[in-house]
Amino acid sequence: MQSQKIRIRLKAYDHKLLDVSVGEIVETAKRTGARVAGPIPLPTVINKYCVLRGPHVDKKSRDQFEIRTHKRLIDILDPTQQTVDALMKLDLSAGVDVEIKL
């Protein structure tokens, strides 16, 4: 597994939950002897939704809602077999989406 790189992308709606998960991954990787680059904050995607407030006529009265998707990127350089095993056993929060590329 030498001279390889594991790239981990994390997405979540709650940035505090995301930072806790990133901290767990970085701590696990450093404990097993791998080098870690990151966490790199990626741009936050903001989806805005405009909804009519009333059920009938009044088009001028609207509500706006938004969903913010926060993203982080972590590169694990020179991972060992212990690093891969520890990352597979790691239990992250339910609100965090994880994408792993080798």
Curated annotation (Swiss-Prot):
<dbReference type="GO" id="GO:0003735">
    <property type="term" value="F:structural constituent of ribosome"/>
</dbReference>
<dbReference type="InterPro" id="IPR001848">
    <property type="entry name" value="Ribosomal_uS10"/>
</dbReference>
<comment type="similarity">
    <text>Belongs to the universal ribosomal protein uS10 family.</text>
</comment>
<dbReference type="GO" id="GO:0006412">
    <property type="term" value="P:translation"/>
</dbReference>
<comment type="subunit">
    <text>Part of the 30S ribosomal subunit.</text>
</comment>
<dbReference type="GO" id="GO:0005840">
    <property type="term" value="C:ribosome"/>
</dbReference>
<dbReference type="GO" id="GO:1990904">
    <property type="term" value="C:ribonucleoprotein complex"/>
</dbReference>
<dbReference type="InterPro" id="IPR027486">
    <property type="entry name" value="Ribosomal_uS10_dom"/>
</dbReference>
<keyword id="KW-0689">Ribosomal protein</keyword>
<comment type="function">
    <text>Involved in the binding of tRNA to the ribosomes.</text>
</comment>
<dbReference type="GO" id="GO:0000049">
    <property type="term" value="F:tRNA binding"/>
</dbReference>
<dbReference type="InterPro" id="IPR036838">
    <property type="entry name" value="Ribosomal_uS10_dom_sf"/>
</dbReference>
<keyword id="KW-0687">Ribonucleoprotein</keyword>
<dbReference type="InterPro" id="IPR018268">
    <property type="entry name" value="Ribosomal_uS10_CS"/>
</dbReference>
<protein>
    <recommendedName>
        <fullName>Small ribosomal subunit protein uS10</fullName>
    </recommendedName>
</protein>
<dbReference type="Pfam" id="PF00338">
    <property type="entry name" value="Ribosomal_S10"/>
</dbReference>
